[in-house]
């Protein structure tokens, strides 16, 4: 799923040109090399690649359930756990898509394939090629930017073309509002300060230029990543939490 197209981001004062698209050369749609300092490929596999995926994921058009106004998702990763709090009012279309993807375990066993220090962590290419193929063109309409791309906020990756969001997501590692808000990246949730301690530990030493190719991830799945980028961290499970506690606050 190369939904993170070319989104040439001119990250001034310390950032190089980055892109948030769902294609191999973009940033906020496909964070490259999102892994934590781990040595062995086997240790970073997350859930077993042999485990069957939810067959409902092969029919994106049917996954249209409306999300609760607020909900949480617990990510259990090879680096630790963190919780995402979603506010549907910020981006209803994006929140509904995320809710359905998580409900059907789309993100289970997926890798943080792109981690750019001080910029973003990107994920959302399925561990399973048939699932990636099914969601390749399951695009969403763009939404107004109500919340800013501050540290800890989650946003869909997209290309420079309109209406190209699908399933790839990035977490802002710093305040990127000045660069990404005006490009139409609309946050729909956030990771709190405690959870960002885990996100900050995701392996980032492959760099933005030394990470995997998005097309190959889509075609070959998790084995491709485990072989070529064994230190990448991954998501073991992403699970819906019934209610979002009032205490949860953005980073």
Role assignments for model-derived ranges:
Residues 1-4:
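Positively charged n-region of N-terminal signal peptides that target proteins for export
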Residues 7-18:
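Bacterial N-terminal signal peptides
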Residues 22-251:
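Cyclophilin-like peptidyl-prolyl cis-trans isomerases
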